[in-house]
From Swiss-Prot:
Record: glycosylation sites: S136
Cofactor(s) named in the record: Mg(2+)
PROSITE patterns: AMP_BINDING
EC number: 6.2.1.3, 6.2.1.15, 6.2.1.24
Modified residues (N6-acetyllysine): K208, K357, K387, K633
Organism: Rattus norvegicus
Protein's name according to its UniProt entry: Long-chain-fatty-acid--CoA ligase 1
Membrane topology of the entry: Single-pass type III membrane protein
Subcellular location: Mitochondrion outer membrane; Peroxisome membrane; Microsome membrane; Endoplasmic reticulum membrane
PTM sites of type Phosphoserine: S621
Amino acid sequence: MEVHELFRYFRMPELIDIRQYVRTLPTNTLMGFGAFAALTTFWYATRPKALKPPCDLSMQSVEVTGTTEGVRRSAVLEDDKLLLYYYDDVRTMYDGFQRGIQVSNDGPCLGSRKPNQPYEWISYKQVAEMAECIGSALIQKGFKPCSEQFIGIFSQNRPEWVTIEQGCFTYSMVVVPLYDTLGTDAITYIVNKAELSVIFADKPEKAKLLLEGVENKLTPCLKIIVIMDSYDNDLVERGQKCGVEIIGLKALEDLGRVNRTKPKPPEPEDLAIICFTSGTTGNPKGAMVTHQNIMNDCSGFIKATESAFIASPEDVLISFLPLAHMFETVVECVMLCHGAKIGFFQGDIRLLMDDLKVLQPTIFPVVPRLLNRMFDRIFGQANTSVKRWLLDFASKRKEAELRSGIVRNNSLWDKLIFHKIQSSLGGKVRLMITGAAPVSATVLTFLRAALGCQFYEGYGQTECTAGCCLSLPGDWTAGHVGAPMPCNYIKLVDVEDMNYQAAKGEGEVCVKGANVFKGYLKDPARTAEALDKDGWLHTGDIGKWLPNGTLKIIDRKKHIFKLAQGEYIAPEKIENIYLRSEAVAQVFVHGESLQAFLIAIVVPDVEILPSWAQKRGFQGSFEELCRNKDINKAILEDMVKLGKNAGLKPFEQVKGIAVHPELFSIDNGLLTPTLKAKRPELRNYFRSQIDELYSTIKI
């Protein structure tokens, strides 16, 4: 049968008939068809496309075959074998920087700025040159090029930190960071524990603090302080009197330049960093982190996000989170091994927004406290009902796209509503990651929509080199911390006294992989508490597996928790101090990971309160006094005074209290038979008072 006969058979017009029909159409109609076709083609070519997820997002982790303990691994992996290195030639921090030199083609590496000035950059090879000079100078001063040689850094984030760090790694030395918030006693402890004989300090004020320890014979091991900024000769003379050499960083570089030593790079198993964690009780613990630990964790991040993101020399990171913590160290390591640029903030968090506008970063790691401030500021500026409605409406439209896996910053809502928010961060951010403490699902979901970039949430701790779980590309839901990273396994173990059972998908989170640290420096007892005989790290966090294979953190094994800014709180220690208040019989200190401060429920002493109040000019029955707001204020002031005298840090002090007239007891279910507080029951019992305190207190 001929083709034209087939057309007739199916009553379909031949091409010649279609042409004749088209000729009869009016010009306006033809133009309309043409415009519609053009718009359809344009939409198809430019329509927003969902990011391709690396695995089935309904099952992001799978159980490891052959295990009976419910061990799970990332579904991104093809089999049960964990990822060790993403790049075969990058196995140490030194290797990573050398790769950065190559892939960047000696491009800009580290940038800094002075007030009201643009960023000034030094190249990768310039950093490598300075690093070799610093390392060579240390060897000239008698320090050994080996992983038993510890070098202290006491500084804010700045280019010199990376240069000094690379100088240490070039010669297999180990970096020991120090930071202000540890306190003087903790710094003294670390200097002695790590036997630091040389410390690099950014400012003369920190050098003076270190000298005080030597002068008071508290840190006799310290012999050299290298200062980055300019300083007076008085400081040199002061150092000479107690046997400490004060030298400028530039002078040290010059010494190394004329005494160059061939690099002696480290092995993957060698120590890279001793990261001291503040903890809650006792002295800081020095987590021993190897080069393999760091590069393995970096590799896990790269593998988990490779379907949607690979860093490049065009990327720019804003460095403001403390380099003394592993989170920022890992982020910067990922950037450097891809030849990206790192721009440092001016050192003043109040100027961060100005730094962002000038630097225009593409990578922006954050902590929940900053996200909360951004969220509050955005909604604070939406000061009319119309503005608030528009903001809510636009965010809901963007959230709908997120649920479809679409991430973009060029929608109508971005142009009308969110452009100003995005511009405040420089306008070029393409990836954000948050960690260190939990973030509110409301805040995270809104900012994911408003900022229009890939926004990941991670979970981990220093002992697993910052991260062990990470949300995956395409899963922009909140309320979980993602799936196990491709570099480690996760399992949950029973916590019987808290009624958490691994068989029900709840229990203490345990981690195993090449990112798990070697132990605590010179502290076998606490190492044994953290690492079991099979190499599992016990985090102390209680987790729950969700149906999609992601992990949700729901509790702490011990009564220790973090506030929104990441500080650890030991409530029982604080309660024992507050119980010294004459008027207080019982106290329950409470904090939440999404709140920046503590509150407390206080039960006054029924026999003491009336006379205590009378001395302060208050009269009434016990119940009346408990309801008196002025009494509430007086009790709080007395507690805070006791806390200050006992050395509580500002974040350990409660900011508000609710006075309750009835004692916690076994009968009302708030105490155990051994008269210990049942904290979950107390939390639930006083939920309304807790919520009211958090809603009314502004700090």
